């Protein structure tokens, strides 16, 4: 853990209340504790719970062995050449004469994961299409349902307000929508961009879901069937972009109108980025090994899974430093969550929470060794990022980062007390605390800092404008997590989750409670969509994307189980995203 102490030293030198003697003592204490990690379980006499988490499938040696030929100059040169060809393709496309073709191209570029190369070009294209076809109802007259649906989705995604009434011409007297199968698929995808009180889109989602499920049973075109079945599992708006890219590159050759040059560029870009992600993961793995936290037998060793969360948040090549920071934050949250949920006694947890709130390094002698280690890891990582931000961007962010950990631990201790008292909270009482205890808010706050080009007091205060957006993103992750993990967590002795709280309060069956939570997630997405439309332009686009991508990751990780907690479920994605090139 010597490297972790090195992280803290520069910041401590900036703090006049802590002497150099204390810094040296902190360094020595941390190094000593590192040697004691492996003995924590053997010296323990307190009777503690165990979650019996499965061990990690990914050894340090395996991660360090990852390599890729796509770091070579010849691949980079070919990528630059293909990028130029695709850019010309966008610029020469005539969106006025054939808007559907151009919208399909934009959609393909996004799903193939290469749209980040052409942000200005895509922005200009969508602006022209909006002005010529979507700005006012009189421009909709000659547009079919397919064009309206695809344009609606892409334009709403990029911040344009397109009213739901654009679809009313395609509703018959019975309330059914009229269109072919591709139109229905695009309308289905468009409906997930709804906000509150948009009944036309609610009806569209219900109708198209039923229509597509019925069509899937009898459809002869297996290529279209492939796209329908994929959409019914994960609508595009709820899909993790990098996971979607991995899937879409494989099926894009089957799509009508596919472009071989676009496909070649997408494959090459995916493999080049995979090489970048391998190096990021190797660096994170070295840090994880230095902390020795993987030797904590009571906690989940999930470094690779935590790294996946950061790739979901932002996979772009320039965000390497950010992924490094966020992987550390994710990993520490996972371990500290297990401390509060399973391993720690209530007196220990109350003391730990008090020390986090005071942020007093001199008070940690009162803690058991395993909690000293947890506190020092957060303390040092916070100091490191504070120091780097102060030296690189000229602003002291330590209070901002410290508060993120304090808010998290204060939510954890509430749940620990609920468990200790055998208390089942009401549904509303649960979610008012659980949106924080899911651990997403600290990630978002760190991500905000990492995406700011200029860090100022005004910028840090401005995030308060996004509090509702952040809360709803956290809440979706919380509820998707509950849908996928609550049964396992109850078996190991955790507190009741949202499903059980709703059942206890309302008398509902588990099936009824799950249906309620599922609809609650849909309604929360509507709020998130609206907040993104209203205030998204006030923040860096990469930050807004991160906020939206985290609930997408919640759906991905916890649909049909717990990919974060059960390594076997996540294994195929490690190989497809980080090991095997396309």
Curated annotation (Swiss-Prot):
The keyword Isomerase does not apply. Its cofactor is Mg(2+); Mn(2+). A motif (DDXXD motif) lies at residues 337-341. (2E)-geranyl diphosphate binds at residues 300, 337, 341, 478, 481. Binds 3 Mg(2+) or Mn(2+) ions per subunit. Keywords: Chloroplast, Lyase, Magnesium, Metal-binding, Plastid, Transit peptide. GO terms for biological process: diterpenoid biosynthetic process. Pathway: Secondary metabolite biosynthesis; terpenoid biosynthesis. It is found in: Plastid, Chloroplast. Expressed in young leaves. Detected in mature leaves, inflorescences and stems, but not in roots. It catalyses: (2E)-geranyl diphosphate = (1S,5S)-beta-pinene + diphosphate. Mg(2+) 2 binds at residues 337, 341. Monoterpene synthase converting geranyl diphosphate to (-)-beta-pinene and (-)-alpha-pinene in a 94:6 ratio. The Asp-Asp-Xaa-Xaa-Asp/Glu (DDXXD/E) motif is important for the catalytic activity, presumably through binding to Mg(2+). PANTHER family: LYASE, OS04G0344100 PROTEIN-RELATED. This is (-)-beta-pinene synthase, chloroplastic. It comes from Artemisia annua (Sweet wormwood). The gene is QH6.
